[in-house]
A protein has these predicted regions:
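Acidic, metal/cofactor-coordinating or nucleic-acid-engaging core segments within structured domains
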Residues: 2, 182-228, 232, 236
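Short helix/loop capping segments that flank catalytic or ligand/cofactor-binding pockets
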Residues: 33-35, 116-118, 179-183, 244, ...
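Short, solvent-exposed loop/turn segments at secondary-structure junctions
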Residues: 29-32, 112-115, 175-178, 239-241, ...
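Extended, H/D-rich, highly charged conserved domains that either
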Residues: 18, 22, 98-200
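SIR2/sirtuin-family catalytic core signature
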Residues: 1-24, 32, 216, 220-320
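A Trp-anchored, charged/polar loop motif used as the substrate-binding/catalytic surface
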Residues: 4-9, 83-93, 147-157, 210-223
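Short, conserved loop/helix-junction motifs that constitute active-site signature segments
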Residues: 91-101, 162-165, 251-257
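Gly/serine-rich nucleotide phosphate-binding loop at the start of the catalytic core
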Residues: 1-120, 124-127
């Protein structure tokens, strides 16, 4: 792929982001180096790795809840990465034509840290944005999947116009460090809880029925989003070791109007992802690695995807 083709690809990605129903799948790679990957943790077995990972996620997320923020350099880099990414998503939604596609982006993440929530909270202090984490309630908030299908509009002070407010929907199938089981429901709290609702990354085989039901309900919600016409899914930081999510993506690709772009961290990742998925590329399913996007990318991260999407102009929405 020559330089001209690479620039054309970037333009195409920007165009899809503003003209299609926008979806993201964000995996644990996006929170590195603040939170290590499972394979980076020195331990005797997966059980010990899961335990050490959970402690690190709880510690890091606890720091994100403090005011003022006091973060290490690694934590600060990751937080600002998420903050910039979500700010660009908001800008894309503001440019989108709500008569063609909803001003909504779905963020589906297997991470159970609070980087996204903290970044969203920071953005909402200055910008108009609806954040939908699926919760219902005020003082006591419970997760309910029926809450995901909401759009919010601003009708003007004199009811003289209706303007859809941009919204970001967060779907967390692996749970979160601020989720607590309460009377067979999931309560979302503003603190790190003692026994959080978390699906361990090594799989669902040993999980209790309550967690298993939550996981598959969240998958169902996301599957419905990907089945919608004129949709695009960008995947970053995710290696498809979760077979359930991999199966969901392969099924979703059967929707001919869905475009899936998976971004690999390194040039070797394409073969790894395809092997994990037991799948092949096709017209609406592409895996992009650093060499596909430009010589300036030694690796490809969430911040690099942010940079590509942030270059959008109205010119990008026009047909070539």
């Amino acid at each position: 792929m020559n330089d001209s083709e690479k620039e054309s690809l970037k333009k195409q990605l920007r165009k899809l982001a503003i003209t299609k129903q926008l979806n993201f799948l964000i995996g644990s790679g996006a929170s590195v180096p603040a939170i290590p990957l499972m394979g980076m943790i020195d331990a005797e077995n997966d059980e010990e790795r899961n335990s050490k990972l959970a402690v690190k996620v709880r510690e890091t997320s606890g720091l994100l809840l403090l005011e003022p923020l006091i973060l290490s350099s690694n934590e600060d880099v990751v937080f600002k990465g998420y903050l910039n990414f979500l700010s660009v998503i908001l800008a894309l939604l503001n440019l989108a034509n709500s008569r063609q596609v909803p001003k909504n982006a779905n963020v589906f993440t297997t991470n159970y840290d609070l980087f996204i929530e903290k970044a969203i909270d920071t953005i909402m202090q200055n910008d108009r944005l609806v954040f939908n984490d699926g919760a219902n309630g005020y003082l006591t908030r419970y997760l309910d999947s029926t809450n995901y299908n909401r759009l919010v509009s601003y009708k003007g002070l004199n009811d003289n116009y209706i303007n859809e407010i941009p919204s970001i929907t967060l779907i967390k199938p692996h749970g979160s460090v601020n989720w607590e089981k309460n009377k067979e429901k999931i309560q979302i709290k503003n603190e790190i809880v003692e026994n959080p609702i978390i699906v361990e990354p090594t799989g669902l085989e040993s999980q209790e029925t309550f967690l298993n039901n939550h996981f598959h309900e969240m998958l169902r919600v996301f599957q419905l989003e990907l089945d919608k016409p004129q949709s695009v899914l960008f995947v970053i930081g995710f290696s498809f070791q979760d077979k359930h999510i991999g199966k969901m993506i392969k099924r979703a690709v059967q929707n001919p109007e869905l475009m899936v772009y998976i971004f690999g961290y390194s040039n070797d990742d394409k073969d790894i992802y395809l092997k994990n998925l037991e799948f092949t590329e096709r017209r609406n399913f592409k895996i992009l690695t650093p060499k596909d996007l430009g010589e300036e990318y030694a690796n490809f991260t969430l911040s690099n995807l942010t940079d590509i999407l942030s270059g959008i102009t109205l010119e990008d929405t026009k047909d070539d």
